[in-house]
Curated annotation (Swiss-Prot):
PANTHER family according to UniProt: POLYCOMB COMPLEX PROTEIN BMI-1, RING FINGER DOMAIN-CONTAINING, POLYCOMB GROUP COMPONENT
Keyword Nuclease: no
Gene field: bmi1a
InterPro entries: RAWUL, Znf_RING, Znf_RING/FYVE/PHD, Znf_RING_CS
Domain of life assignment: Eukaryota
An example Gene Ontology molecular-function term: zinc ion binding
Cell compartment(s), UniProt: Nucleus
Disulphide-bridged cysteine pairs: none
Matching Pfam families: RAWUL (PF16207), zf-C3HC4_2 (PF13923)
GO terms for cellular component: PcG protein complex; PRC1 complex
Protein name, per record: Polycomb complex protein BMI-1-A
Length: 320
């Protein structure tokens, strides 16, 4: 999966701010010769005394530099959507200006120039805005069979309507659905727009921007519930071979270090301890732990008539 990283608005500031005034673009305007952008008022005032770009010194025009600048609506929309509250504050400043200066003729300007455009008309969504949404169960079989009048009535009855802040994420909505419907943790919930699953880090504002929600109704969301996939533990064959080789080498070293008088522990009949732990080497003269307790088998495989002799510290000892 691709890892998604969030970046801060300060990292984008060099692309969103005017070098002439040091603020965010307002009425972004671009020079067509070099594609550098500025605020409209800033670049118009600058070109009154200069014919060169303030960033790269490219000549804008020999005699009339204002002919080679263009309004950049796309860049301005990006700035308004990325910077919280910028559009609302700018519209308020314009309304206040024309209220304090009624003599200024603004009849020829647009509604945006006069500050009479609301966030809804501009499709600008703020973090603290309340968004209405509808949530319903996603039934792929019903979509394949087609919608009848009865199914449409059922869908209307199964819809639930919520009012949530625009900054709420899909993860919060999933947690709300799980707690509301008592869905056990063995099932996973997917929130969807139409038939496309949504990422957990998407906010309602992101969904509205990505899928161009027009505010002509509640934001339509769906959800589905399905069992969680269990993760299977995969053992690599290489590890098994290494373990087998390791056990063989251990058993070989044990045989090499054993005294000559001690009989071999290998036997054609399996002992109970070997049935319990088949992967470990078994020694009949050593008590084996079973279920955390040490047990000594009374009936050993090998019955010694005499006590064996073993070399201890280079000397032979025997007990009668």
């Amino acid at each position: 999966m691709h890892r998604t990283t969030r970046i801060k608005i300060t990292e984008l500031n060099p692309h969103l701010m005017c070098v002439l005034c040091g603020g965010y673009f307002i009425d972004a305007t671009t020079i067509i010769e070099c594609l550098h952008s500025f605020c409209k008022m800033c670049i118009v005032r600058y070109l009154e005394t200069s014919k060169y770009c303030p960033i790269c010194d490219v000549q804008v025009h020999k005699t009339k530099p204002l002919l080679n600048i263009r309004s950049d609506k796309t860049l301005q929309d990006i700035v308004y959507k990325l910077v919280p509250g910028l559009f609302k504050n700018e519209m308020k400043r314009r309304r206040d200006f024309y209220a304090e200066h009624p003599s200024v003729d603004a009849a020829n300007g647009s509604n945006e120039d006069r500050g009479e455009v609301a966030d809804e008309d501009k499709r600008i969504i703020t973090d603290d805005e309340i968004i209405s949404l509808s949530i319903e169960f996603f039934d792929h079989r019903a979509q394949q069979q087609g919608c009848t009048e009865e199914r449409q009535k059922e869908e209307v009855n199964n819809k639930r309507y919520l009012q949530c802040p625009a900054a709420m994420t899909v993860m919060h909505l999933r947690k709300f659905l799980r707690s509301k419907m008592d869905i056990p943790p063995t099932y996973q919930i997917e929130v969807m727009y139409e038939d496309e699953p949504l990422k957990d880090y998407y906010t309602l504002m992101d969904i509205a921007y990505i899928y161009t929600w027009r505010r002509n109704g509640p934001l339509p969301l769906k959800y589905r519930v399905r069992p969680s996939c269990k993760k299977m533990k995969i053992t690599h064959p290489q590890e098994g071979l290494n373990n087998a080789n390791r056990s063989e080498s251990d058993s070989a070293s044990d045989k090499a270090c054993s005294p000559a008088g001690v009989p071999s522990t290998s036997s054609p009949l399996p002992s109970p301890s070997t049935l319990v732990q088949p992967s470990q080497p078994h020694f009949t003269h050593i008590s084996s732990p079973i279920n955390g307790t040490t047990m000594t088998s009374p009936n050993r495989q090998f019955n010694f008539s005499k006590v064996r002799k073993s070399a201890l510290n280079g000397s032979s000892t025997s007990s009668g």
